[in-house]
């Protein structure tokens, strides 16, 4: 164990440190964090508008409110790529101490420039009340419009790429003073607005070249290129439940050695969000969610189950402790754990570098995820409400799962919770018995010294 720990400290710790200091990873994390006021802001409306009770949904449709819920929620979910590209460019450029707001606006404009802006619709003259079966469309018309398929989850990868390209160009040209020089008496607001005009021209010319260049390829645009060659393979891999369980297991493995799983979260989260919003789009359209297994594994195997380490089972096990040390730790860690904050328990036991807790800490995601997938098949769960992806990450698992899948998903929660306890209890019992012996020895020693 000592040799392995030294190897980790020599290899993974420097890598983790570099990744945490990396401007791209940091800006990427900040880009999604800055979207949280939007996603959390519509969380309540999302729950009301898509509450998983058919009678309620039918009622909203009958009084005409369903379309308004869809419109308000769509203003966030169907425009996520726009928000992310602005936030990324702002954060990245701001970290280099240049004007992040200007870079963010240039990034939005660049993203829109690269989008297909024409929708082809059929032209029908003398529209009858009913079309005969023999009717054919003999002509089409082009309508100028932006498609939400590109501004939403499908465009996230391109949004990040464009935000990064714009940021790099903006920073490099700013370093070379490729800006308009204005007299000293000009107000700062005017200077900030006019000085990057040349940089804007260069960036837009670059975007024009990218747009034209892709138009001559079989992909026709950068979005199809990204979807087919980048996004589809990556999401396909992560959507595999066994790969996802492996990633969560590796994250807990890092935690055991004191390395925060944010090391992989910055890379994984954009893919998970892309899949989550694809689920939301499908569900809102009345279709089955395309990434059902991902939702099931995430519900029980990620940090949405008592935080890192899946600590719900540990908290319940701690109620059996007779040790004063663990009784006090339970008071400190129980409530945070309910809301998926497990650090008080991880550091308080401690679980890190504690061989006793290696198995329950590291292998919970794989065990719970496998059982949940099996139970989902037995209970014939074929669709879930993905709107819970918009809820805060601190939402307790039973609340999230009840909204997402109703009674069948709550049954899975209950069974997995029992399993969670059974996995943690034997290891915790050894720990609290040892602590109890130490406390008794300390009391006896204190008594002998007093005598």
From Swiss-Prot:
Membrane-spanning parts: 40-60, 69-89, 104-124, 151-171, 190-210, 239-259, 263-283, 296-316, 332-352, 356-376, 403-423
Topology of this chain in the membrane: Multi-pass membrane protein
Main localisation: membrane
GO BP term (any one): carbohydrate derivative transport
Gene disruption: observed consequences: The galP/llmg_0963 double mutant grows poorly on galactose.
GO cellular component, one term: plasma membrane
Subcellular location: Cell membrane
NCBIfam families the record matches: lacE
Domain notes: The EIIC type-3 domain forms the PTS system translocation channel and contains the specific substrate-binding site.
Protein name (database record): PTS system galactose-specific EIIC component
């Amino acid at each position: 164990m000592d040799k392995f720990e030294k190897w980790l400290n020599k290899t993974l710790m420097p890598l983790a440190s570099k990744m945490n200091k990396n401007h791209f990873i940091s800006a990427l994390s900040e880009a999604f964090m800055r979207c949280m006021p939007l996603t959390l802001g519509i969380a309540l409306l999302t729950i009301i508008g898509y509450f998983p009770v058919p009678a309620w949904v039918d009622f909203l449709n009958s009084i005409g409110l369903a379309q308004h819920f869809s419109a308000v929620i769509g203003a966030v979910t169907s425009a996520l790529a726009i928000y992310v590209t602005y936030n990324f460019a702002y954060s990245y450029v701001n970290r280099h101490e240049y004007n992040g707001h200007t870079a963010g606006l240039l990034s939005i404009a660049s993203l829109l420039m690269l989008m297909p802006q024409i929708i082809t619709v059929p032209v029908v003259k003398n529209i009858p009340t009913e079309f005969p079966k023999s009717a054919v469309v003999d002509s089409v018309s082009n309508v100028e419009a932006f498609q939400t398929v590109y501004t939403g989850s499908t465009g996230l990868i391109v949004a990040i790429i464009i935000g990064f390209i714009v940021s790099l160009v903006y920073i490099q040209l700013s370093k070379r003073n490729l800006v308009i020089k204005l007299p000293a008496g000009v107000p700062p607001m005017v200077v900030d607005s006019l000085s990057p005009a040349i940089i804007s021209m260069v960036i837009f010319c670059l975007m024009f070249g990218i747009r034209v260049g892709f138009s001559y390829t079989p992909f026709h645009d950068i979005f199809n290129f990204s979807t087919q060659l980048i996004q589809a393979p990556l999401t396909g891999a992560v959507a595999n439940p066994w790969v996802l369980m492996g990633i969560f297991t590796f994250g807990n493995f890092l935690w055991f050695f004191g390395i925060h799983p944010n090391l992989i979260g910055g890379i994984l989260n954009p893919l998970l969000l892309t899949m989550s919003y694809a689920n939301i789009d499908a569900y809102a359209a009345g279709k089955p969610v395309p990434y059902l297994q991902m939702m099931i594994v995430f519900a029980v195997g990620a940090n949405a189950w008592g935080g890192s380490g899946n600590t719900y089972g540990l908290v319940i096990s701690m109620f059996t402790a007779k040790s004063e040390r663990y009784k006090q730790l339970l008071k400190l860690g129980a409530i945070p754990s309910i809301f998926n904050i497990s650090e008080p328990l991880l550091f308080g036991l401690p679980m890190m570098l504690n061989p006793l807790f290696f198995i329950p800490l590291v292998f919970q995601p794989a065990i719970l995820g496998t059982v949940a997938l099996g139970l989902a098949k037995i209970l014939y769960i074929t669709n879930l409400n993905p709107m819970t992806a918009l809820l805060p990450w601190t939402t307790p698992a039973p609340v999230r799962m009840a909204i997402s899948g109703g009674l069948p998903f709550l049954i899975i929660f209950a069974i997995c919770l029992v399993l969670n306890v059974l996995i943690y209890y034997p290891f915790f019992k050894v720990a609290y018995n040892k602590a109890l012996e130490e406390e008794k020895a300390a009391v006896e020693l204190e008594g002998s010294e007093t005598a």
